[in-house]
Design a protein with these regions (language model features):
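Alpha/beta enzyme core
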Residues: 1-144, 151-185
C-alpha cells in the first residue's frame, strides 16, 4: 500500500531458505504471493534433488514455477545456493534455466553455511567465478543476480563487471557512502 503508484516492485520468496518444499507447495506459494502483489518471485531450488542428480525433478519444478509466474506477469529468480554446489551442478542449473527462459539466475539465499574441516561454519556467497560462469551459460535474456557476501563497494563493482545485473546487499548505506566518497553519482 505504501508503494502504490510508484515503480517499486515487491519480491517474495518461496521455498525459503532450504528449497525443500514440494513443487505443489512452491506453486501454491507462487500463486499466493503474486495475488498478494508480488511482481518478482525468488525460488530456492531443491538443493538435495540437484545434489542427488534428480535433474528431471529440478527441471519440472523450475518450469512449473516459471509458468505460474509468466502466466501472471511476474518474474522468477531461481536461487541456486552455490555454496552447496560443484561447478557441474551450476552448469546443469544454468542449462535448465535457459531451457525454461527464467528471468534471473541467482547465487545464494545468504543462509548457505557449510561446515569446514575444522568444524567451523563458513559462508562464501557470490563469487566472481560463479557470476562469470552463470552469465556465460545463461540465456542472453536471463539476468544474473549476485547475492550473499556483497558487503563492499569493491565487491559490488567486481560482481557487476563479472556480469551481474543485480546485487543483493545488506550494507547498502556503507556502499552508497563509499561511492559518494569516490565521486560516483
Amino acid at each position: 500500500e505504501v508503494l502504490a503508484g510508484t515503480d517499486v516492485g515487491v519480491c517474495a520468496v518461496i521455498g525459503f531458505p532450504a528449497g525443500n518444499s514440494t513443487t505443489e507447495i512452491k506453486v501454491a506459494e507462487t500463486n499466493q504471493v503474486i495475488r498478494d502483489g508480488a511482481t518478482e518471485v525468488d525460488m530456492v531450488i531443491n538443493v538435495g534433488k540437484a545434489l542427488g542428480g534428480a535433474w528431471d525433478y529440478v527441471s519440472d519444478e523450475i518450469k512449473a514455477i516459471n509458468d505460474a509466474c509468466v502466466e501472471q506477469g511476474a518474474i522468477l529468480k531461481v536461487i541456486f545456493e552455490t555454496d552447496f554446489l560443484k561447478e557441474e551442478h551450476i552448469v546443469k542449473l544454468c542449462e535448465i534455466c535457459a531451457q525454461h527462459k527464467v528471468g534471473f539466475v541467482k547465487t545464494s539465499t545468504g543462509f548457505g553455511f557449510t561446515k569446514n574441516e575444522q568444524g567451523f561454519y563458513s559462508y562464501t556467497g557470490a563469487t566472481e567465478y560463479n557470476i562469470k560462469l552463470m552469465r556465460k551459460l545463461s540465456d542472453p535474456a536471463t539476468q544474473v543476480k549476485a547475492a550473499g557476501a556483497v558487503r563492499s563497494l569493491d565487491k559490488l563493482l567486481v560482481m557487476r563487471a563479472a556480469g551481474a545485473t543485480r546485487c543483493g546487499a545488506t550494507a547498502t548505506k556503507v556502499m552508497l557512502e563509499e561511492a559518494k566518497a569516490r565521486g560516483y553519482k
